[in-house]
Structure formats: structure tokens, C-alpha cells
Amino acid sequence: MTDITPYIILSKPQLGENIGSTARAMKNFGIEKLRLISPRDGWPNDSAYAISAGADNVLNNIEVFSTLEQGTQDISLLIATTARKRVVGTKPLNIFEAVEKAFEHTMNGGKIGFLFGPEQSGLSNDDVVQADFTISIPLNLSLIHISEPTRREG
């Protein structure tokens, strides 16, 4: 069976607690592939483990990279998340279009990644232009939508 589980990529996360919270949410939806790009407080981080509520399997397998280019070089479909309207060249999709594209892509053997920016500022335009698409996820539905590709059967 094809592995359709996405990678969650946190670019320049600022607090270990937010990494732990992300891992906890990922575990709740069966997503275990977490990558960090240049975490401000370094990795590993005790604060992440303290708040992760048992998501050690996610935290223990985190991959850390210095640059976004390094952390996404094997990702064949990168979807950047943003709350702002962007005028840079990346095509915006609604969440349902993004899920469908991600599912189709993984069924054809591709690796997908959802890219999230720093807590305080979000993704820079330089980060966004490296993505294939952008999406804006309604806050109260974000975890449901990100887990959607893992619910599909091939």
C-alpha cells in the first residue's frame, strides 16, 4: 500500500511548547513525520516533550534541517499555509483542492509536505515562493483537514 501520510514542516519554530503541541495534534490524527527548519531554541527541547502528551514517537523521529531547501529537497509537492493574501507567484488553493491534489500526488508515489511558518510572523514570501501551492486553513478545522489524506484508502 502506498504511504500517503504527509510531512508536517515547521519553519523556524520559536517555542518548544509549540513543537510539542504540534506533535500531540499530529499523533491524534496518525501523522508522524515532523520536520523542523532552524528551530530557534534548538532540538531536542524538554518543553516540547513536557507538553506533547505522549507523542514521543513523533518527537523522537523529528528531522532537523538548517534551511528550507535542505528540509524539502525530497518533497515533491510542497503546500505552504498562510493566513495572508499573497501576491507572490504561488497558486492559492482552497483546502479541498489541496487535499485532492495531495491525495492524487501521494497515490502516484510522491511525497507531500505542509509548511507552517514561525508563530509570530508566519511564512516569509521567500518561503512561500518555494511551495507549489498555498492554502489558508480555517483555524478551527485545521487538524481535520490536514489529516484528510491519511483517511483515504488506495
Locations of the language-model features?
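Short, glycine-rich nucleotide/cofactor-binding loops
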Residues: 7-19
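Single conserved hydrophobic/aromatic residue that forms the stacking wall/gate
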Residues: 144-154
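Short internal beta-strands
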Residues: 33-39
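Hydrophobic, well-structured mid-protein blocks that either form specific transmembrane helices
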Residues: 111-143
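Histidine-anchored nucleotide/phosphate-binding helix
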Residues: 19-28
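S-adenosyl-L-methionine/SAH cofactor-binding core of RNA-modifying enzymes
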Residues: 46-123
